[in-house]
UniProtKB/Swiss-Prot annotation:
SUPFAM superfamilies: Trypsin-like serine proteases (SSF50494). Factor XI triggers the middle phase of the intrinsic pathway of blood coagulation by activating factor IX. The gene is F11. Residues 20-103, 110-193, 200-283, 291-374 form the Apple domain. The lineage of its organism: Eukaryota, Metazoa, Chordata, Craniata, Vertebrata. Heparin binds at residues 547-550. The keyword Transmembrane does not apply. One of its GO terms (molecular function) is heparin binding. Glycans are attached at residues 90, 126, 163, 450, 491. One of its GO terms (cellular component) is extracellular region. This is Coagulation factor XI. Changing residue 56 to R: In FA11D; secretion of the mutant protein is impaired. It comes from Homo sapiens.
Amino acid sequence: MIFLYQVVHFILFTSVSGECVTQLLKDTCFEGGDITTVFTPSAKYCQVVCTYHPRCLLFTFTAESPSEDPTRWFTCVLKDSVTETLPRVNRTAAISGYSFKQCSHQISACNKDIYVDLDMKGINYNSSVAKSAQECQERCTDDVHCHFFTYATRQFPSLEHRNICLLKHTQTGTPTRITKLDKVVSGFSLKSCALSNLACIRDIFPNTVFADSNIDSVMAPDAFVCGRICTHHPGCLFFTFFSQEWPKESQRNLCLLKTSESGLPSTRIKKSKALSGFSLQSCRHSIPVFCHSSFYHDTDFLGEELDIVAAKSHEACQKLCTNAVRCQFFTYTPAQASCNEGKGKCYLKLSSNGSPTKILHGRGGISGYTLRLCKMDNECTTKIKPRIVGGTASVRGEWPWQVTLHTTSPTQRHLCGGSIIGNQWILTAAHCFYGVESPKILRVYSGILNQSEIKEDTSFFGVQEIIIHDQYKMAESGYDIALLKLETTVNYTDSQRPICLPSKGDRNVIYTDCWVTGWGYRKLRDKIQNTLQKAKIPLVTNEECQKRYRGHKITHKMICAGYREGGKDACKGDSGGPLSCKHNEVWHLVGITSWGEGCAQRERPGVYTNVVEYVDWILEKTQAV
């Protein structure tokens, strides 16, 4: 894991429109601007460490060289410059470069490289015999404390140390030194690659304090942000958060990062107004966790002020923060009546660790974070081809997570839609499988625009398993959700890639850009459409939806969408397909097409499975299988 938890809200010293520089400069040293020095096995990994550091903009790495003092080999000097550059000097074996913060491609802490003849130093806390370096790395990945390892091969000179696997950790998550040592290999834990088999506990426990060692503390607006900070701190295994109602004023909004020798809390104490939870570092699912887009009303974030500018709204203030060179978070003060043409004051701020230095309530401000990290690409957040405004037919690559599910019995036909949520997983509706006796008769086609493209020789994914929610009875009763595990993995391309699942912390997000897609009927008595159809539809409150369906119970596990006058909606054949909503430039799978009365009828909105209420179920099933 990369050191420093501040990755959650790191500072960018380059403008959003600044150039992304990926080139490494050989035999070049950046002079000055030193922040700190760490040890990394390669310049490439040094660049990743710089990217995840809250203040690092540039770096200089020293490679192994006869001309350099061996004590300087593998040093990674992290640097900062408010001018975005530093003087360059020639130096043999020096490799310099820039942080990836200003780049739009995927940034990941995952490092699967194995380093031959390198001993990465740290605290050796576990020694055991392993058959191979791969087995040693797997042990490290499945050990809650392990950051990296060193393995002595069968050719190691000392017979008694051959095949020994040393698991190691440090305070920063990076080695304290790296030295040359023949016949050993070293590498990092693959927890950041979502490959750990450790338990993943996503629940946040109210009225609970974990009474264990505090390794650090920061200020956070809610328990969800506290949990994300814990997840990206190399030593944090669990946390306790004191809410704004906590009795002791000086501890309100305090996020305590904790650890224990066993890896679990030793004692749980019942305390009102406290919440506790666990690091998600070991979870085997790639839900984006770096971005926190919520607004905090009647809340002021304190920190170093970068600038004070006029803004019409807190949304505009957040945009100013996102576009500012160094802004991490902001507080917006609404305008007084008839003052400054209705514009309020937008305070752009930063701190040394990326979190507010203090959080105050009751002063009328509205606070939030930069959205810069929301625009970082990930498997499910990669920029998708722009929507085509107007019309109903989609274009190729417009909805790359949409799949068409076919049955081959008695003849092959489109059965339902579905969404790619992982490289072996499709999320769809449970009611699609009424009468389906075996997954062997199912075929999943991805990257398809027209049903007519599907021929006998068109490639497809077989279905290994159908997982239906165990509380499902019928669509109108809820729990209309199912997972398909594919027989083979999906290789992500521009035309087939996953959509992000919503975060439990975003339950209160108001989505305004939502689309339903599918090959279903356009009216009640119709046929399956050849070309993938799309319709932009507004969400409807559950209270309003309940008024339209008095004969049914609209629960919080359902979400409704549609126009009061009708005209646009999902229909037969769209079942199981996505209700996709864009928020902060990221598409989320907000709903699964489930049921409704008729097709696009007046005052009869479509009813969808509310995906955010099933995130834990999805993760439990996809990790367990």
